[in-house]
């Protein structure tokens, strides 16, 4: 009986010593959790602070284009450009239409007028203007309905018009993916050439996107259909998101 009392007394003394050591170090049992929570909160504040300080934060972006912008049969809220805008709390305007060309008028085919004309209808105020197109122009040329020279002349007019409409905005273009079809490579080359003449940055999605349009297995995973060579699904947009984000941050 006396031995049990001594054991209890020793346990009580050790418990008091342990508590005093914790208090001397400025930590309580609940303080351990509080310290962890503070570290996590500080990390979140650092992340948020980085977003607040980013050049995109709170700015207005007009995105004009074809189904790469409209996002075809899926909501445009899944598109990489919308996701980037959301991350940086941007005012996002989507001016995408399925089937639209940069230069060629497809009104007779029920796909509407080109960006060369439609850009005038966009809101006049924007900090960023992102143009995504060329896929339908390449198809139009491949079908013999337009020429590469017409495309170049029209694109030159579009660039001059955008600069006049948005003299203070940051302009940029994104080319089509590397589609294994006639005229796509030539159209991409013209986009880079004409935009280069006006010092407008271009993201060459045919060479730097990491989007392997020609691979059937890849398309099954990241496109809206196994035979689709234009439209990313939600996973595809997530895959491309970081590259698009870096491009916009660097404008």
Regions found by a protein language model. Name each.
Residues 1-64, 68-76, 85-90, 122-126, ...:
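N-terminal secretory targeting modules
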Residues 29-48, 135-158:
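N-terminal-biased segments
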Residues 57-63, 68-148, 153, 182:
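Conserved SGNH/GDSL esterase-like catalytic core that processes O-acyl groups on lipids
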Residues 78, 82, 86, 149, ...:
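Solvent-exposed, polar/charged alpha-helical surfaces in well-ordered, non-transmembrane soluble domains
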Residues 91-93, 170, 199-201:
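Conserved beta-strand segments of alpha/beta enzyme cores
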Residues 108, 178-251:
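Catalytic His-Asp segment of secreted/periplasmic serine-dependent ester chemistry enzymes
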Residues 135-136, 159-191:
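Active-site segments of SGNH/GDSL-like serine hydrolases
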């Amino acid at each position: 009986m006396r031995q049990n009392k001594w054991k209890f007394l020793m346990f009580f003394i050790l418990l008091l010593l342990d508590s005093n050591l914790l208090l001397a170090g400025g930590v309580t049992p609940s303080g351990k959790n509080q310290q962890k929570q503070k570290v996590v909160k500080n990390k979140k504040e650092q992340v948020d602070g980085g977003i607040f300080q980013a050049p995109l934060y709170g700015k207005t972006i007009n995105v004009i284009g074809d189904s790469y912008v409209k996002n075809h049969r899926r909501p445009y809220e899944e598109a990489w450009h919308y996701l980037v805008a959301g991350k940086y709390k941007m005012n996002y305007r989507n001016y995408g239409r399925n089937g639209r060309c940069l230069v060629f008028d497809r009104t007779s085919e029920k796909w509407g007028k080109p960006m060369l004309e439609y850009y005038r209808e966009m809101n006049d105020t924007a900090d960023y203007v992102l143009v995504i197109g060329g896929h339908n122009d390449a198809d139009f040329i491949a079908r013999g309905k337009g020429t590469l020279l017409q495309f170049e002349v029209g694109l030159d007019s579009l660039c001059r018009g955008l600069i006049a409409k948005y003299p203070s905005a940051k302009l940029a273009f994104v080319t089509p993916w590397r589609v294994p079809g006639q005229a796509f490579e030539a159209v991409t080359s013209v986009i880079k050439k004409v935009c280069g003449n006006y010092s407008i940055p271009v993201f060459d999605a045919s060479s730097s996107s990491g989007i392997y349009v020609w691979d059937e297995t890849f398309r099954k995973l990241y496109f809206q259909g196994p035979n689709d060579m234009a439209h990313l699904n939600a996973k595809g947009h997530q895959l491309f998101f970081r590259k698009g984000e870096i491009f916009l941050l660097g404008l």
